[in-house]
Amino acid sequence: MEEKRYTSDIAGHCNEPTAWQILKEVSEQLAEHKQLVVNPFIIEICEDGHFSLLPSETQVVGFDAPEADNTHRNEASVVWSLGATLFHIVMARQVMNGKGGAGQKEASKLPYMRSEWPKMSELVQQCLRYQPTQRPTLKQLHDSATEQYSRCTEEVRRGPKFKKKLNSLTDGTINATNNMGFWPETMHETHPFNPITEA
């Protein structure tokens, strides 16, 4: 019997289609089971290629929303945790210098994920907003992730498009596996929530 694997095991090695798939499947499971805790250590990678959220009532340090604790959580706080979870899976780093919501203030700038994944980076920033009412809902996350996952898988089916010559070391498509530890947690201002739709 193979040892169980979790999304924490692929942190920094996750491609864009897989990241959208994780968001799509986990947001749906959170809504279905009314679970208010999520982090990379309780999302199991199944043998059939899907992802399963394991039951948990205790959060890991660095993945709780600024307004949440072990007794006061709601959908908005779990959306924040899901954004922090996705950031960790893609970047192999924790938000707010590992402190999570405990280290976030209303004036804090939000971490920007990857220059070549602008839609996902924007959506994660929306999840990590300090004010709970400014975050997307689980349904909005699921709908956006479903659309973007379909786009990614269609692009894989059609094959790569021609890309312009890079203007700098941080332009274009750069594989996370080859750049672990290279990407800084840069900061970027955000704007009022507007659910992502494909242009």
Regions found by a protein language model. Name each.
Residues 91-95:
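Structural helix C-cap motif within protein kinase domains
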Residues 8-21:
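Activation segment of protein kinase catalytic domains, centered on the conserved DFG
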Residues 26-37:
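Protein kinase catalytic-loop region centered on the HRD/HxD motif
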Residues 67-76:
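Conserved end of the kinase activation segment
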Residues 153-199:
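Regulatory extensions appended to serine/threonine kinase catalytic cores
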